[in-house]
Design a protein with these regions (language model features):
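Bacterial N-terminal signal peptides
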Residues: 19-27
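Sec/Tat signal peptide C-region and signal peptidase I cleavage site
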Residues: 29-34
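Zn-dependent metallo-beta-lactamase
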Residues: 35-110, 344
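C-terminal regulatory/interaction regions
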Residues: 36-54, 315-344
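Metallo-beta-lactamase
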Residues: 68-72, 81, 87-89, 111, 118-120, 138, 197-198, 206-209, ...
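Conserved beta-strand hairpin/beta-sheet module of binuclear metal-dependent hydrolase folds
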Residues: 77-132, 136, 228-249
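Active-site HxH/HxHxD metal-binding segment of metal-dependent hydrolases
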Residues: 92, 120-123, 129-206, 296-307, ...
């Protein structure tokens, strides 16, 4: 048995058993006000039970919250994905679901949102924004990391909710447009909505808002227009830290894709002095758990005392990832060359 597997399965069984019990009880609820109130109470109990079971399932270091949320059907379960928003720095907030991140970078002149997740989790993001006392109409830009639905699927609804301009690379705007109407596998196959095409970002572009002067880098591979952003300034009292958001490593299949992966890795390694890696998913291979996980760091942040180091300030996370990207890219090129030589 994998270490922690029994603990995880036991915790997840509790989720399904308790949720099923509440659903069976709700089947007998009639239209009266009292019965409606009982139905709401039952739903609340189911939600609380799911949260408790999830918490119970993450007591082992081998099964942190990041991993639970990522596993198979759990990435589709709304109750499993519901987490409270949290403040990471004076000007950075996490407002997304459990498995994929959504961040808000604040400035006195307006805010920038990084990624939107997808339905059925967008209502959670809207609620989390309000819980952090952020005025959604102060969000000026929504930046999409790449054209996969789990990163842009909530953009249309949040575009309307905030009035912000949605921003992506031209290559991935094309991907986004091609996704319109396709089934969303995390929302019972409902058709995917796409945002209005507001604004393009290209390699070397700058996006300035308040004290933030962001520099855009493209890294084709995971998608044709995958990007990462440097220049993010994070405040923790009197301290400031240099942040970076997004991926950047890896290339597309084939020799040309692998060679592009090497170029991407060189670009990633050229960014120096990064102190905070703002992840696009709660987990982050190859750093593993709990060191690379957003929620593991958040747990440490919640109990941080004055004078303690900030758990999200960790230059090694980005440096290790950058080095791994370079090593993996070179291996991929060698593998593709060997395939070409052998004819396989």
């Amino acid at each position: 048995m994998t270490p922690g597997m029994g603990l995880r399965e036991d915790g997840m069984r509790k989720v399904w058993m308790l949720t099923a019990s509440c659903l069976m009880a709700a089947a007998f609820v009639g239209p009266s006000v009292a019965q409606n109130a009982e139905a709401e109470a039952a739903a609340a109990r189911a939600s609380a039970a799911a949260a408790q079971a999830r918490a119970n399932a993450t007591t082992s270091d081998s099964d942190p919250l990041e991993k639970i949320c990522r596993i198979g059907p759990h990435s589709r379960e709304t109750e499993i994905q519901k987490i409270a928003p949290f403040k990471v720095f004076d000007n950075l907030y996490h407002v997304g679901p459990c498995y994929v991140t959504s961040w808000i970078l604040t400035t006195p002149q307006g805010h920038i949102m990084f990624d939107t997740s997808q339905e059925p989790f967008v209502g959670l993001i809207e609620d989390n924004i309000k819980k952090m006392n952020i005025n959604p109409r102060d969000i000026k830009y929504i930046i999409i990391n790449h054209g996969h639905t789990d990163h842009f699927g909530g953009a249309k609804r949040l575009q309307e909710f905030t009035g912000a301009r949605v921003v992506a690379t031209p290559q991935d705007w094309k991907m986004i447009a091609e996704t319109e109407g396709k089934p969303n596998n995390r929302d019972n196959g409902k058709p995917t909505d796409v945002p209005k095409h507001d604004m393009d970002l290209n390699e070397g572009d700058h996006l300035d808002l308040g004290d933030q002067h962001l520099i855009i880098h493209t890294a084709p591979g995971h998608t044709p227009g995958n990007l990462f952003i440097e220049g993010i300034v994070l405040h923790d009292g009197a301290q400031t830290y240099k942040g970076i958001w997004g991926g950047g490593g890896g290339g597309a299949p084939g020799l040309a894709g692998a060679e592009q992966g090497v170029k991407n890795a060189e670009k990633v390694n050229a960014v120096k002095g990064v102190q905070v890696y703002i992840q696009t998913h709660a987990w982050q291979d190859p750093n593993g758990y709990p060191g690379g996980g957003v929620h593991e760091r958040a747990k440490k942040l919640a109990t941080r005392k004055p004078g303690d180091p900030h758990p999200f300030v960790d230059a090694n996370t980005w440096n290790d990832r950058a080095k791994a990207a370079q090593a993996n890219a070179l291996k991929a090129v060698e593998k593709e060359k060997q395939k070409a030589t052998s004819g396989k």
